[in-house]
């Protein structure tokens, strides 16, 4: 079972993944140190943001986290790969429905047209898999590495689907509440609403994966 400390750790990582840390249009990557602190302080420019004290602890150069990669695609998919400088953990976090530029795309194209109609966010899943493939092929990212996966809301749906696509690799799991995944053609639910926390050894969501 996850400890309170572990739950807080993954919740903080999920919240940090909501921040806009990679801005290729202006050549800015706020992946570590003061830049990362500023990025997670801004968060998603709405309610998901860190206090100064929280941000400094999260990005502490000796015990905290850095960002190895963040992507955002035209389907609204966004993922962030984190690395802990003390424990050497890697965590892959999928962002929830975005409230700014991707709001209409996430809610209409993904949530209404794909999830409600077909059970899967197909466009974002395709982008998730393509991005994961590049990470898994790179030893500096996820190649040969054990890592954890988190997701919230739409990101929870993606984390669930990520696990379903590689059931044999999952050892344990946790995530925050997410959208339901698809139903069987016969009407039975394949994966229902995500529970508040998927506990260790619960294979309904991923924790430790090794590509």
Segments (PLM) and residue ranges:
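N-terminal low-complexity, Ser/Thr- and acidic-residue-enriched intrinsically disordered segments
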Residues: 1-47
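Gly/Ala-rich beta-loop-alpha elbow adjacent to hydrolase catalytic centers
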Residues: 150-155, 159
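Aromatic pocket-lining residues of Rossmann-like dinucleotide-binding sites
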Residues: 162
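A conserved cap/lid and substrate-binding interface adjacent to the catalytic center
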Residues: 38-150, 165-187, 192-211
